[in-house]
Amino acid sequence: MGMIQREFNESNKLTLFNGDCLKLLKSIPSNSVDLIITSPPYCIGKAYEDPHDDIETFKKQHEDIFDDLYRVLKTGGSICWQVGYHVSDRCVIPLDYIVYDIFTNKSASFENPLILRNRIIWTFGHGLNSTKRFSGRHEMILWFTKGEQSVFNLDAVRVPQKYPGKKSYKGPNKGNLSGNPLGKNPSDVWDIPNVKAMHVEKTDHPCQFPVAIPQRLIRALTVPNGLILDPFMGSGTTGVAAYVENRRFAGAEILKKYYDIAVERLEEAVIGNVKIREDKPVAEPNTNTAVAKLPGEFAKARREKV
């Protein structure tokens, strides 16, 4: 496997562990991880999850790993936890509330409690359609820091301004350009396409998130050669982002078939062949193309509706 190691050592560039994340966590020294990024299995009925998973299982999973997550994280380090919703009997349960309660309550008495810095909305254009409620098109990323001080490199993640030529219309800077020449703050709403069938990053994993998400977090919240941890590695997306951004990575995946996908992707990253969609604004459709034009039967249905 070359650069990829199966057992953790702080000198490793890439550690990919096939097994329970608790075993990996036990092998990592205290106060050594700069950033934890993950998207845990969250009882939404996908093929790779236990069909008996429920909210109580989700809670216990987080309670069981929290102490070791906190232990390995550096003071001043960050945790970014990406979750969605659990739908049961048409009732939507926001899982980020559960994560917030567990993480803040369990660390409240510590010298450096976890502090929620941002509740980032990840919005995407495609997903399951619903006829009984508005179709879900967003999930959450909770960014916590261990204590008050933390890395935040805004210039590394600025995005293009919509109107870069905009000028101040009053005050002492009247007539001067009002924006930052490097771009604007990406805000806490991130419009990044999710990984569906035709996405360049698509693998056989059913709940793969795009490289652009961990890539943006890694750029903003760590420095080169920092250590990134993903306890629920899945297809290795966080590892790909870490390697591309010149950070060290350690991840665990309990299912062999997804572990093998992660290994393959990281091997491709090492030789420079991994497929990544660039973190760029979502393109507006070209209305001259057939797929973007309103089909005649749709137009007819709309007229009949009116």
Give the positions of each predicted feature.
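Core catalytic lobe of class I
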Residues: M1-I261, F298-V306
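Conserved SAM/SAH-binding loop
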Residues: N18-K23, K280-N286
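Short alpha-helix boundary/capping motifs
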Residues: T57, E245-N246, A269-I271, R277, ...
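Short, flexible loop/turn segments with low-complexity composition
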Residues: D155-R158, N273-E284
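A contiguous, mid-protein "functional segment" used to position or interact
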Residues: E253-K275
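Intrinsic low-complexity, glycine/proline- and repeat-rich
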Residues: A283-V306
